[in-house]
């Protein structure tokens, strides 16, 4: 059988590409690549750009931003198209650096851009000249046009959020900010000061950048089609120019308005790297520099930071291949940049010149011709009879002067070589002696060193000057520590300083806009816009335009906290700021209540036009964290069994009082909804009376001291909660409760209803539970000369019900304080237990390290592990404490399921969190913890350390859920 031989490899090489398997493999890879590209395109954000962009501009945008943005061009003819499209994408890129839905400040940006996209951005848009006001007018008209053309979309939008104040004068607080081409008028130092006043910890911005500004007086940014020129300032007004040096930006071949900015401000972003304000340091980081735009970041850092040296370089890539040619007459001609290759060619031609050097010196015209021909030769080359460009053409006015300067440079080099040759020859001892004193041995050089006028201009001028490729800048920042160094006046001004990083994240999600208050020394302008499309614009503080805030029911503006006409000392200034903060806090709580119920109403299918709900299943889920969530039906019944009375409810008509036949939602905030009344009760003036604190340990007899110190004719007793008020009434006015109610009041009652009789002194029980602003308001309302507060500064202080609200003045600031470390109530084992916990958390300065007791009870504490909450039956004679609201909700749920009835008071009075039970003494306490993790008692949270200080006898049990 004959064997047939053939080459398999040749067969594969010739026909392999047509194989079905190969085609399938290629198709699979191609399909996968196409799918990835489509997915990438879908992830990119669509950006609608009005401008016409060329193909090269589109490639630049793609290279700069990658696939982040999908440009949708409407192809309208607009000025400086590429720069405008870049600015739009830069804004979106900077906004994407921060958490979504967080409040962001925009220094100098367009509020219309953010309003059209409903960004949570507050824009500071100061009116620095008529051009800025024209921009505002244009944006107002554009907004009206949007509403008129598409009312279904834009009428539901909130009003634009912006102000007409400078960035450093606006008082809206946020840890995040952007500045898109808005830093030219502020400079690096001004931008840092604006960040400091806003409590901003990170800023992202962009600006036009050309490193050649540090070297030359004019230049061109080709990608932006923009020419810049520097103008020398005229501080004395002799030439009619601006006082300071300016940089003018003109867009080539576009007869649009140009931009002029301070050279000092622009230069600061090229030369500076850091700035320090007190204990806060601001560090500038330059990110991307491309197509004439620099993207930068500024971070605010504080704490314990050593002495820092910041070094950065500014490179000049555009001048790397150039040299400066200095013409022979600098009074007429400035320095001219010439390509380095051109200069090299000229030097080569001069060295290869066939004529003798001596003849060139004599024949000036011929040497000039040689120089000119050398420049011509360097600019063009002849290949096979064809002329081709080899270098860069010079300006027609500079051509001959540059050629002459290059010829003089070459001639002087020949002179130097001749002198060098002569210096190598031996000319006797005299010349040798002079050469030992100076290298050249020429008397002219010796005297010229001390008498420059003896040197000819030809000898001292530098015809060819090498340009620097890089310039190094070093900035130094001082050392900072982590200790607060603020006096009372600085505390009143409060610029966050060392607490900056601690509160920044909490502020980031706070959408509340606090308009800047009008300053007496500022000159402001009120802008009013009336249009049927936009609607009426409410009156706001001068110079401020903000988005609408949800007004609580029956809010009156008659009793607002305003600035005093006379300057305040530090103590009164702090009190006034505390009262302002307390009022803002109350209104924020009211807004939160309405917002939460509105979201719940929407989840149930409710709308602003109808009370018909689609599903109430979400309410069953919400009751796990808030047992008071409920739905009132039209027939008067409730969705879940209810034992409470609610002041207000929420439905399509908003938050307020409801009729028995209405459908509405309620939660725990609707039981007692008096935030608006409390806010209206805050007076406008700070109190001048003294505030003294009796700071005692738990069970030291604070309430007993109040009873003994009380003077019926002139004193008023104020308590932080209703339970303490009832206890004092029973102890002091058991037989005359009606009279006692005028002498023993809660803090909320004083704010809402005032004081009926003259008060000389206020005795405040559990003063640490209230906001310092509320304490000051009560002292002002009562008109008392003194307020004595009884409480424990180390137990649970005032805790905000809005974790995102920025609290600065809630802590007590008494004029004097007196400590008491003896307790009558707490058993001995409780005292020792708290001492151990205080040491565990490192509270070395705590008064609980040295407290002692007179109680005879030695053992009252115990603990017991249970597998679930059902394993421990609820006892009617015991008060239950929890550390979390979730544990409290589980206990309340069990109490309602088992129809638990306590022997005293109601279910909500015997089941509380450790914070809610502050200041209450009961015989028996059980602390329930629903998880078996590391014990929370050994932390720095005060409500966890002192949960065992409420019982007065032998009954305290700690139940752990396994």
From Swiss-Prot:
Pfam families: CMV_1a, CMV_1a_C, Viral_helicase1, Vmethyltransf. Residues 536-561 are annotated as: Disordered. Residues 667-820 form the (+)RNA virus helicase ATP-binding domain. GO terms for molecular function: ATP binding; helicase activity; hydrolase activity, acting on acid anhydrides; mRNA methyltransferase activity; RNA binding. Residues 693-941 are annotated as: ATP-dependent helicase. Interacts with RNA-directed RNA polymerase 2a. This is Replication protein 1a. It comes from Pelargonium zonate spot virus (isolate Tomato/Italy/1982) (PZSV).
